[in-house]
Amino acid sequence: MKAVVLTVAVLFLTGSQARHFWQQDEPQSSWDRIKDFATVYLDAVKDSGRDYVTQFETSALGKQLNLKLLDNWDSLSSTVSKVREQIGPVSQDFWDKLEKDTVSLRQEMNKDLEEVKRKVQPYLDEFQKRWQEDVERYRQQVEPLSKELREGARQKLLELHEKLSPLGQEMRDRARTHVDALRTHLAPYSDELRQRLAARLEALKEGSSFAEYQAKATEHLSALGEKAKPALEDLRQGLLPVLESLKLSFWSAVDEATKKLNTQ
């Protein structure tokens, strides 16, 4: 139905000047628009119906049932098109006769509509005039309030900023003072700690204990390497079958792909 509604909307929005604009012929009459509307409406119903059938057939239930509704719908649409072609002359003759028989009626209706329009137009103009005046009056009343609100908000922000600026500067100054004082208090202890550490390292380097530590470290590393060697060998042996299997799978996939390419 969305397609139908869209088609109807386009038809009425384009109005009687659409064909005149594109085909450069005389503007359509109301009667011609009614006939075109009927034709376009039927085409839209047919197209939208096919869309719904397609959606159903592509659904899980439609695939399971396998009703082949789309083929049947296309056959039905083809049959309907043939019937429309066959009855086209008869239909045109009907529309022509009906249009001829209702000429006087449509003329009277158009005359009545024009008369009603003339009577109603002053009220419409008055309504539009008053509405525009009310909108302008409302705008004039609201504009000063909006300006006052904007100016008030800006003023309050400025006042708040002026009050907070000294406080923020004072806090930054106090924090800087505390950091400087802490650095001053810690400086002697930092120097003492660096001196003690340097002395310990120098004594360790000059004494026999440094060589002892170095020898022990080398011994520990060698022992670790000997202990890790069997574990690394076991790991290598365990990975060999896995790597071989991966290699076989890879080449098998390559051979299969090659065969498929050669057969094409």
From Swiss-Prot:
Region annotation 10 X approximate tandem repeats: where it falls in the sequence: 67-264
Sequence repeats: 67-88, 89-110, 111-121, 122-143, 144-165, 166-187, 188-207, 208-229, 230-240, 241-264
Signal peptide bounds: 1-18
Single GO cellular component term: very-low-density lipoprotein particle
Compartment list: Secreted
Classification via Pfam families: Apolipoprotein
The family this protein is said to belong to: Belongs to the apolipoprotein A1/A4/E family.
Quaternary data: Homodimer. Interacts with APOA1BP and CLU. Component of a sperm activating protein complex (SPAP), consisting of APOA1, an immunoglobulin heavy chain, an immunoglobulin light chain and albumin. Interacts with NDRG1. Interacts with SCGB3A2. Interacts with NAXE and YJEFN3.
Residues modified to Methionine sulfoxide: 109
Molecular functions (GO terms): amyloid-beta binding; apolipoprotein A-I receptor binding; chemorepellent activity; cholesterol binding; cholesterol transfer activity; enzyme binding; heat shock protein binding; high-density lipoprotein particle binding
Name the record gives this protein: Apolipoprotein A-I
Modifications the protein undergoes after translation, according to the UniProt entry: Glycosylated.
Any single GO BP term: regulation of Cdc42 protein signal transduction
InterPro entries per the UniProt record, alphabetical: ApoA_E (IPR000074), Apolipoprotein_A1/A4/E (IPR050163)
Source organism: Ictidomys tridecemlineatus
Role of this protein: Participates in the reverse transport of cholesterol from tissues to the liver for excretion by promoting cholesterol efflux from tissues and by acting as a cofactor for the lecithin cholesterol acyltransferase (LCAT). As part of the SPAP complex, activates spermatozoa motility.
Gene: APOA1
Upper classification of the organism: Eukaryota, Metazoa, Chordata, Craniata, Vertebrata
Keywords: Cholesterol metabolism, Glycoprotein, HDL, Lipid metabolism, Lipid transport, Lipoprotein, Oxidation, Palmitate, Phosphoprotein, Repeat, Secreted, Signal, Steroid metabolism, Sterol metabolism, Transport
